[in-house]
Amino acid sequence: VIMDLFKAAGLPDGVINMVTVSGKEISEVVFKDEKFAGLHFTGSTNVFRTLWKGIGNNIEKYKSYPRIVGETGGKDFIVAHKSAVATEVATAISRGAFEYQGQKCSAASRAYIPTNLWGDVKEQIIKDVNSFKMGSPSDTSNFINAVISEKAFDSIASYIDYAKNSDEAEIIVGGNYDKSLGYFIQPTIIVTTNPQFKTMVEEVFGPVMTIYVYNEEKWEETLTLVDKTSEYALTGAILSVDRYAAETACKMLENSAGNFYINDKPTGAVVSQQPFGGARGSGTNDKAGSVLNLLRWVSPRTIKETFVPPTDYRYPFLGE
């Protein structure tokens, strides 16, 4: 459809070409060509690292150094301060974790809730999840649809089963899945006593949120924990009425999320308004949807023209 739109808009044939093939197959051809000039990749962190290694192994073959841009995985967070409003925190979780079944790299998948808010937040998110309608996307009243494939279904289900069988975790809502009539997974919220629990660290890429309840007086310690828990740094959000606490979080988490949200869910960046991307294991942070990304693909050329060329090599300070 995209190529049809380009053609209908008048783009000449050959300016853009679409080749549908596996990344492994095409990389074995493209990465060995001396004219290879750049890669813009969106996908998993491990695949991106493999592609980068492949480019590096062929670096002597290329006419120039290839540009490499990647937007990869995320383990995106929500952190609530003790001053936050419980209903706002619950809504950020419900929307941030479960829109599109959590199948986007910016979806929230771990949350840190203070002890003083936990009772109210827990009650609201359970109420929210139980109210979700699940079914076909053709019915726009359905908040939850099927996940994209059987492979994704099986992977997500394995994380849910891991939590069910762990002494360090409790599923407070959801936890069921069924692929008899489509790859449907019930939105699931896990509460863990271990901030390094598997589903707090690894990217699940599905409708699974894991929550760690922290001592309400340990704000800065919790922010440090958030920063060090995951290899990713794509998106994150903090919710706080206390402005000083929000500014503290903004500073302490400056390397934890390329897209950082205050009093909102950590997803839903608007193209051309909120440049998107993160660093660490989440990619090269070249900000898709902005001029910053476009500049990665140009090759600047500097030209100097002298209108009065010198006729003597001697500079004035050299004397006669």
Question: Could you say what each language-model-derived stretch is?
Answer:
Residues 1-27, 59:
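PLP-dependent aminotransferase-like
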